């Protein structure tokens, strides 16, 4: 998983 994916999930 990329940092962007983790950020996206955390954002929601």
Curated annotation (Swiss-Prot):
Main localization (coarse):
secreted
* UniProt GO cellular component terms: extracellular region
Q: Does the keyword Glycosyltransferase apply?
A: yes
Q: Where in the cell is it found?
A: Secreted, Cell wall
Keyword terms: Cell wall, Glycosyltransferase, Secreted, Transferase
Molecular function as annotated in GO:
glycosyltransferase activity
Question: What's the Enzyme Commission number for this chain?
Answer: 2.4.-.-
- The answer to whether keyword Glycosyltransferase applies is yes
Q: What class of enzyme is it?
A: transferase
Q: Which family does it belong to?
A: Belongs to the UDP-glycosyltransferase family.
Descriptive protein name: Putative glycosyltransferase
């Amino acid at each position: 998983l990329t940092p962007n994916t983790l950020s996206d999930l955390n954002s929601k």
